[in-house]
């Protein structure tokens, strides 16, 4: 889903979110735990990666665009933004399919930074925000809480996780907490459709 669409969906519903998914770094096979928790802030994240329209694909996904925004859920306001283009190193030339799908050009990724450098910049951005707004990813600590919001688990559970493993990059601990907004919107659709079904039945 488009990054701006995810963001606007969150703002329009002014969510009281729960069901944080916690993924441990060491084993992808470990179960995902869920807890009910309300948040004051969300960081909306939506990677773009290398991709192909062939099977098998010509390579593995590498992040090429790393955008994020911090949302205040009480107001719906965007408080801060982060954006970097990332230079792929395993398959440095973007496919025509990828460029058409993402709108990202070869020149943009050629001028991008390595993923490791991007993670360092992003971690610094996160640290400043946590200090500025006195927020924490640790839901066991009293105070204001924040987590990531993604469209499906692909961004953090698969794409970033696997690329960090392949490139032997240390993935920051805070990336192990996120909310799958797709599940939330599906729940909203079901809640809206159910009374419609009843109403249609009585016509």
Summary of predicted features, one role per range:
Residues 104-109:
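Short glycine/proline- and acidic residue-enriched helix-loop micro-motifs
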Residues 115-117, 128:
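Core catalytic alpha/beta fold that binds nucleotide/phospho-ligands
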Residues 33-40, 60-64, 70-102, 123-203:
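Metal-dependent phosphoesterase core characteristic of DEDDh/y 3'-5' exonuclease domains
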Residues 56-58:
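Short glycine-biased active-site loop of nucleotidyltransferases that positions the nucleotide triphosphate
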Residues 1-47, 52-53:
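N-terminal accessory regions of nucleic-acid-interacting proteins
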Residues 27, 117, 143:
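Short, conserved clusters of charged catalytic residues that mark active-site
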């Amino acid at each position: 889903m488009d990054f701006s669409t995810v963001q606007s969906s969150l703002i329009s519903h002014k969510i009281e979110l729960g069901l944080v998914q916690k993924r441990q770094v060491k084993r992808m096979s470990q179960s995902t735990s869920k807890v009910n928790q309300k948040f004051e802030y969300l960081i909306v994240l939506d990677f773009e990666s290398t991709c192909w329209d062939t099977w098998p694909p010509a390579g593995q996904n590498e992040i090429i665009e790393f955008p994020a925004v911090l949302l205040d859920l009480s107001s719906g306001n965007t408080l801060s933004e982060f954006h970097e283009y990332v230079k792929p190193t395993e398959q440095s030339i973007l496919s025509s399919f990828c460029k058409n799908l993402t709108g990202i050009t070869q020149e943009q990724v050629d001028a991008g930074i390595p993923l490791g450098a991007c993670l360092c910049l992003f971690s610094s951005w996160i640290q400043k925000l946590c200090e500025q707004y006195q927020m924490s990813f640790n839901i066991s600590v009293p105070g204001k809480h924040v987590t990531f919001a993604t469209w499906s688990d692909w961004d953090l559970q698969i794409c970033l996780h696997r690329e960090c493993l392949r490139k032997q990059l240390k993935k920051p601990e805070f990336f192990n907490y996120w909310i799958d907004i797709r599940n939330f919107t599906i729940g909203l659709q079901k809640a809206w459709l159910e009374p419609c079904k009843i109403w249609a039945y009585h016509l």
